[in-house]
Amino acid sequence: MNSERSDVTLYQPFLDYAIAYMRSRLDLEPYPIPTGFESNSAVVGKGKNQEEVVTTSYAFQTAKLRQIRAAHVQGGNSLQVLNFVIFPHLNYDLPFFGADLVTLPGGHLIALDMQPLFRDDSAYQAKYTEPILPIFHAHQQHLSWGGDFPEEAQPFFSPAFLWTRPQETAVVETQVFAAFKDYLKAYLDFVEQAEAVTDSQNLVAIKQAQLRYLRYRAEKDPARGMFKRFYGAEWTEEYIHGFLFDLERKLTVVK
């Protein structure tokens, strides 16, 4: 099932499901998207290969979740991207929810995880990683490991990191979609149970861990080159620092 029609809107069902499911479980409020970043488009290629690339942004917030945001890139059969990340408020020790769903001319790249604040803390792993390992193992049987990824990135991923490169679009539409649903459900279960942190030392550690993660993601964002090519360097850097990974900017404003 590798049809063009299927690929063109490959990740729209993921996005639609996530928003509807979150609405059913959370009291979602809009999160402000800076002017000029709600959507953008560019025409790339020439002649028969000409294609419009459209990037659309979505953002929400709740009492426990500082920013729930998605960047959806649609550029025809050979370019489909959904980057969907949930950032908790700084007074919760929740992990980040991260889904990177990417289709390029060379194939599909899928990354799903609950990215830990404190990866090497055994109590943190017991609280947030061990409960989801059965979900990881169940899906890993059908979604083989995607191969090496940068060593510098490893501290930001949990032992339940689902990283795979499916060959078939049908696998994305079925098994990857099922994994996405299960990970999101488990994450919202954690959110439901989460209690605010009040200890000042722990709050400092959470803030430092969040900033460490966001700085890494902003610096190493693999979409930077793609966005620069489509929309220019100025728009790209502002989109990355002012929307996709905006915590540092928000904290500066608060000061």
Curated annotation (Swiss-Prot):
GO biological process: phytochromobilin biosynthetic process
Pfam family, one: Fe_bilin_red
Domain of life the protein comes from: Bacteria
EC number: 1.3.7.3
GO MF annotations in UniProt: cobalt ion binding; phycoerythrobilin:ferredoxin oxidoreductase activity
Function description: Catalyzes the two-electron reduction of the C2 and C3(1) diene system of 15,16-dihydrobiliverdin.
Family matches, as NCBIfam families: PRK13250.1
Protein family (similarity comment): Belongs to the HY2 family.
The protein's name in its UniProt record: Phycoerythrobilin:ferredoxin oxidoreductase
Record organism: Nostoc punctiforme (strain ATCC 29133 / PCC 73102)
Gene designation per UniProt: pebB
